[in-house]
């Protein structure tokens, strides 16, 4: 499993630990990933995604999982999230007809 958020694309960052004497040693900043089950109101399905903690509050702020994923850019979504977005769009258009 990659260390990357499936909805925002946030991944591992690299930097330095800097001591008091200004010695620099390389380190990795890992995202705070959580495996979360999101419920779609449109498809009435549950989807388990690996997202960072900040993304969870962003989804709530956007008005739910469906609203967030429909606004999200396809370039940052994982292939799994893109498939979910496609399914939501198809279901939404089928219900509107």
Curated annotation (Swiss-Prot):
<dbReference type="GO" id="GO:1990904">
    <property type="term" value="C:ribonucleoprotein complex"/>
</dbReference>
<dbReference type="GO" id="GO:0006412">
    <property type="term" value="P:translation"/>
</dbReference>
<dbReference type="GO" id="GO:0005840">
    <property type="term" value="C:ribosome"/>
</dbReference>
<dbReference type="InterPro" id="IPR034704">
    <property type="entry name" value="Ribosomal_bL28/bL31-like_sf"/>
</dbReference>
<keyword id="KW-0689">Ribosomal protein</keyword>
<dbReference type="InterPro" id="IPR037147">
    <property type="entry name" value="Ribosomal_bL28_sf"/>
</dbReference>
<keyword id="KW-0687">Ribonucleoprotein</keyword>
<dbReference type="Pfam" id="PF00830">
    <property type="entry name" value="Ribosomal_L28"/>
</dbReference>
<dbReference type="InterPro" id="IPR026569">
    <property type="entry name" value="Ribosomal_bL28"/>
</dbReference>
<protein>
    <recommendedName>
        <fullName>Large ribosomal subunit protein bL28</fullName>
    </recommendedName>
</protein>
<dbReference type="InterPro" id="IPR001383">
    <property type="entry name" value="Ribosomal_bL28_bact-type"/>
</dbReference>
<dbReference type="GO" id="GO:0003735">
    <property type="term" value="F:structural constituent of ribosome"/>
</dbReference>
<comment type="similarity">
    <text>Belongs to the bacterial ribosomal protein bL28 family.</text>
</comment>
């Amino acid at each position: 499993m990659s260390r990357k958020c499936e909805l925002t694309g946030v991944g591992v960052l690299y930097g330095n630990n800097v001591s008091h004497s200004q010695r620099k040693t390389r380190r990795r900043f890992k995202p705070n990933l959580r495996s979360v089950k999101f419920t779609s109101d449109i498809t009435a399905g549950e989807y388990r995604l690996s997202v960072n903690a900040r993304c969870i509050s962003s989804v709530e702020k956007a008005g739910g999982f469906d609203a967030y994923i429909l606004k999200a850019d396809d370039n940052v979504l994982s292939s799994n999230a893109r498939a979910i977005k496609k399914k939501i769009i198809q279901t939404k258009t089928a219900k509107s007809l």
